[in-house]
Curated annotation (Swiss-Prot):
It comes from Mycobacterium leprae (strain TN). GO terms for biological process: tRNA wobble position uridine thiolation. InterPro entries: MnmA-like, MnmA-like_C, MnmA-like_central, MnmA-like_central_sf, Rossmann-like_a/b/a_fold. This is tRNA-specific 2-thiouridylase MnmA. CDD domains: MnmA_TRMU-like (cd01998). Disulfide bonds join C101-C193. HAMAP family: tRNA_thiouridyl_MnmA (MF_00144). The gene is mnmA. The lineage of its organism: Bacteria, Bacillati, Actinomycetota, Actinomycetes, Mycobacteriales. Residues 143-145 are annotated as: Interaction with tRNA. Coiled coil: none annotated.
Length: 358
């Protein structure tokens, strides 16, 4: 089988590529240049597409004895991931850029090019498993990335491989060391790759500019002014610009955002719970949509809590009724569905949260 191994320069993708070589496949390594800034440098465990990352990926490819190329996807990454990220925050939403990158870049643009060039599969270092064409959680639950892959279609998954999904992270590092790969102890990447400073609010402010509005409570009392709704997300407690707690002595949280009026609403923690969600643009990883209401497990953050819910597809929207409330649910988040069984590791599908109610 002809395999294109996506190599970021990190330990996970390096071991994934090595395993595909060991399996006897015809492997070619490729590094995706996603930054429009020439010579971008890594800042500790933050940043992406740095000169160090390219060099590390190339050295691993040399050790493995496979061809290696750098493909420039910077313009498409800017349009499909960064610009969408900024636009979503300007609308008062809370998107996950890793979800968008997987859906639009790694398993769309990259996969399409790979198939056009005659490759059968794109292998990545994601912590997830494929079994019988079904996407499942990784063995290492602490590193599981099935959440950010749940937007992939059955067709996309047919041409994907996740060689390290059955392995614990510490075992991956140990294997890299045994293979003599210099990335064995390289720090994991954290945060949003295109915001190496880690300051999302500053990044968004630079992109969007100042759009002043008010922070108000449930009674409509103005508590503070702000420079843009992009600096807030539902569930946020710090950085609200409010002095002191609420009149009941309890902390205040962002409970809702109205981008049209530039209003940020705050309230008690009790105001954060929601029981009903509506998701748009649903994707079902196994291909077929569920027939009628189905009980499953839902998750709204990459490593967040889960909850049992009854889900039903009505038209082109996903209606979700939670058995227990979830807190801090925001528009724009990815809602992922898992099969309700003892393992709870099979992904059924996903949608983008369009609205929610208590």
């Amino acid at each position: 089988m002809k395999v294109l191994a996506a190599m970021s320069g990190g330990v996970d993708s390096s071991v994934a590529a090595a395993r595909m070589v060991d399996a006897g496949h015809d492997v070619v390594g490729v590094h995706l240049a996603l930054s429009t800034v020439s010579g971008t440098l890594r800042t500790g465990s933050r940043g992406c597409c740095s000169k160090e990352d390219v060099s590390d990926a190339r050295r691993v490819a040399d050790v493995l004895g496979i061809p290696f190329y750098v493909w420039d996807f910077a313009e498409k990454f800017q349009e499909d991931v960064i610009d969408n990220f900024v636009s979503a925050y300007a609308r008062g939403e809370t998107p996950n850029p890793c979800v968008q990158c997987n859906q639009r870049i790694k398993f769309s643009a990259l996969s399409v090019r790979a198939l056009m060039l005659g490759f059968d599969t794109v292998a990545t270092g994601h912590y997830a498993r494929l079994s019988g064409g079904r996407l499942r959680r990784a063995v290492d639950r602490g590193k599981d990335q099935s959440y950010v892959l749940a937007v992939l279609t059955a067709q996309q998954l047919r041409h994907a491989a996740f060689p390290i999904g059955d392995t614990l992270k510490r075992q991956v590092r140990a294997e890299a060391a045994r293979r003599g790969l210099l990335v064995a102890d390289k720090p994991d990447s954290h945060g949003i790759c295109f915001i190496p400073s880690g300051n999302t609010r500053a990044f968004l402010s630079e992109c969007i500019g100042i759009r002043r509005g008010s922070v108000v409570d449930a009674d409509g009392t103005v508590l503070a002014e702000h420079d843009g709704v992009h600096g807030f997300t539902v569930g946020q407690r710090k950085g609200l610009g409010i002095v002191g707690p609420g009149p009941n002595g309890r902390p205040r949280y962002v409970t809702a955002i109205d981008a049209d009026t530039a209003t940020v609403y705050v309230g008690d923690a009790a105001d954060l719970g929601v029981h009903t969600l509506i998701g748009r643009a649903p994707v079902f990883t196994a291909g077929a949509a569920p027939l009628g209401p189905v009980q499953c497990v839902v998750q709204i953050r990459a490593h967040g809590e889960t909850a049992v819910a009854v889900v039903e597809l009505i038209g082109d929207e996903l209606f979700v009724r939670l058995c227990e409330p979830l807190r801090g649910v925001a528009r724009g988040q990815t809602l992922v569905l898992y099969r309700l069984d003892p393992d709870g590791d099979e992904v059924l599908g996903s949608a983008t949260i369009a609205s929610m109610s208590a």
